[in-house]
């Protein structure tokens, strides 16, 4: 007995519809899984990026803190501002140092030096002899054998007196309106974010005995406590001031 062709066609159509429905479910599940995977991957990449920024930014802060005081006379405090979330200090970041090749009078603005190359206009400079120091600002880029100041020194210096750059640095937490907190790095007036998405930043100041101090003259170490993003585990480190 031959069955009607319409029955076979109906069965085939039902099977196709069931298969399509099953395929749609599988496709939906697969799409959901891919979306979830992409979301997790993006979160992991964001976390890795934050951690990399944290490591690099913290390394820069540590290295520059070690130089605190190298851009000042030896009897001046290495740190000029001690805050829980802000620190300001002077350092000779590029180790730019030279000496006077001739005596300089108190009214002199043009300093004869051994080498003034790569000393940029606007930088603070310090001149020191055995018993006194003075500060000035470069009126223009340094030349091979001279440095020009914006104003006279006010005191005389003998030949052989040391001249060095004093970079002014400041690290602080900035919270843009409605945005995440950033750790900012300011050098000689220009500032930029060095670590983003900061959720905790704390500075503590220690003397040579490892005791907390609020007196800049006695600070020899700085403890840094930093947390980035929503991580429970942050970074805690102590930095000794090499310049003191």
Which sequence ranges carry the predicted segments?
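Short, glycine/small-hydrophobic-rich surface segments
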Residues: 43, 65-97
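Glycine-centered small-residue hotspots that permit tight backbone geometry or close packing
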Residues: 23, 69, 105-107
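Aliphatic-rich helix starts adjacent to a transmembrane/signal segment
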Residues: 2-66
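Hydrophobic aliphatic residue packing
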Residues: 14, 18, 26, 99-100, ...
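Solvent-exposed loop and beta-edge segments used for protein-protein assembly and interaction
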Residues: 83, 119, 163-165, 216-218, ...
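Short linear sequence signals and composition-biased patches located at protein termini or domain-edge surfaces
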Residues: 39, 48-49, 63-66, 80, ...
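Type IV pilin-like appendage domain
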Residues: 86-211
């Amino acid at each position: 007995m031959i069955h009607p062709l319409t029955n076979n066609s109906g069965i085939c159509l039902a099977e196709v519809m069931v298969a399509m429905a099953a395929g749609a479910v599988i496709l939906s599940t697969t799409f959901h899984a891919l979306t979830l995977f992409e979301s997790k991957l993006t979160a992991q990449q964001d976390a890795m990026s934050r951690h990399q920024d944290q490591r690099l930014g913290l390394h820069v802060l540590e290295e520059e803190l070690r130089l605190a005081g190298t851009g000042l006379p030896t009897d001046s405090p290495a740190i000029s501002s001690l805050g829980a979330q802000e620190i300001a200090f002077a350092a000779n970041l590029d180790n730019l140092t030279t000496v006077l090749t001739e005596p300089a009078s108190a009214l002199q603005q043009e300093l004869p030096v051994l080498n003034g190359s790569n000393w940029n206009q606007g930088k603070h400079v310090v001149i020191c002899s055995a018993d006194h120091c003075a500060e000035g600002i470069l009126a223009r880029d340094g030349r091979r054998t001279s440095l020009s100041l914006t104003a006279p020194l006010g005191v005389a210096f003998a030949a052989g007196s040391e001249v060095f750059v004093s970079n002014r640095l400041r690290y602080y937490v900035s919270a843009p309106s409605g945005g995440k907190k950033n750790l900012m790095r300011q050098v000689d007036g220009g500032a930029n974010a060095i670590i983003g998405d900061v959720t905790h930043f704390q500075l503590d100041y220690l003397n040579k005995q490892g005791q907390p101090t609020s007196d800049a003259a006695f600070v020899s170490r700085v403890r840094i406590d930093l947390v980035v993003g929503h991580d429970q585990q942050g970074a805690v480190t102590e930095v000794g001031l090499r310049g003191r």
